[in-house]
Amino acid sequence: PYDLVIMHSQPQRGVELAEEILQAGEHHLLLVPRPQPEMARVLICVAAGEPGKDDVLFTGRLVRHLGASATLLSVLPRDGDRPQARAHTGRFLAAGVRTLALLGVPAQPAIRVGVVREEILAEMTVGNYDLLVLGAPLTRSDGRGALAGVVGQILSNAADRPVLIVRSPYSVNRAPWLGTNGRVNFPKEVIL
């Protein structure tokens, strides 16, 4: 088993290939469009909850080796931007920033309000980040992966920068991922 699979991102097969690679094991996936001179700024996108904690821990261990700083971002929906939700999200992000500091990664929290995909892409542009980190969606009850949703949309729009997809044990321990063709495919790129 591997912790991380790194591969060249391929726009023509982007989301479909990423799903196939994630189906092949319990690893995380780093999609890289081209050689990167350095990764100094990382945007870690999380939702409050246990899978988000896993995203922070894995990414923190990786990012400390890069010597990069991080921004920990959560996006609240417009109709969910209530004081209680904002306070809960703020506490979650503050705990994540403390965790990253313990790992030697300087970090800052950020909360945006709006459509998740649009707000993440806007933050990527404004912050000029070198790496985007997204949590792999939890497997749906029918066993299918959900990269065709928000994560898939972001993968399609962020093709110019590396994207790390972090898998939580909460998604790994559920039903296996099935591809868009309805079966588990084991791509040759992963099986050696």
Per-range role (PLM):
Residues 59, 119-120:
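Generic hydrophobic alpha-helical segments
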Residues 112-119:
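Charged docking surfaces used in two-component/phosphorelay signaling
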